[in-house]
């Protein structure tokens, strides 16, 4: 297994799909990385040479991925919560942030129903 950005990339998958196992790399970014590295999209990771894997590592390192991206996202949410803006309050209360209705739906964000005790 090739190790890129601290993640074991599956050998048996095509390169364009295998790179999506890295957090922050989707299909579009994966295709851009492969094009910049000069590697075909349909080649499997196990068929790549060590030099090609090194170029992939260099190309992936140009983007914010994995732990750095997770930290950046959590810090931006924390910043909103510290500011006390509307979006920050919604994050703090565990409610939908982007204007969805909450009277009937939003069960994913609110969690399971809490029964009213009589």
UniProtKB/Swiss-Prot annotation:
Located at the top of the head of the 30S subunit, it contacts several helices of the 16S rRNA. In the 70S ribosome it contacts the 23S rRNA (bridge B1a) and protein L5 of the 50S subunit (bridge B1b), connecting the 2 subunits; these bridges are implicated in subunit movement. Contacts the tRNAs in the A and P-sites. Coiled coil: none annotated. The keyword tRNA-binding applies. This is Small ribosomal subunit protein uS13. Part of the 30S ribosomal subunit. Forms a loose heterodimer with protein S19. Forms two bridges to the 50S subunit in the 70S ribosome. Residues 94-118 are annotated as: Disordered. Gene3D superfamilies: 1.10.8.50, 30s ribosomal protein s13, domain 2 (4.10.910.10). SUPFAM superfamilies: S13-like H2TH domain. It comes from Salmonella typhimurium (strain LT2 / SGSC1412 / ATCC 700720).
């Amino acid at each position: 297994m090739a190790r890129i950005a601290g993640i074991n990339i599956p050998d048996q998958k095509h390169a364009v799909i295998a790179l999506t196992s890295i957090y922050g790399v989707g299909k579009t970014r994966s295709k851009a990385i492969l094009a910049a590295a000069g590697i075909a999209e349909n080649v499997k990771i196990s068929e790549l040479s060590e030099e090609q894997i090194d170029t992939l590592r260099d190309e992936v390192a140009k983007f914010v991925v994995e732990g750095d991206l997770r930290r950046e996202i959590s810090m931006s949410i924390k910043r909103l919560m510290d500011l006390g803006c509307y979006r920050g309050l919604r994050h703090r209360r565990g409610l939908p942030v982007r204007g969805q209705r909450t009277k009937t739906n939003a069960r994913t964000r609110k969690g399971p129903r809490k029964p009213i005790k009589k």
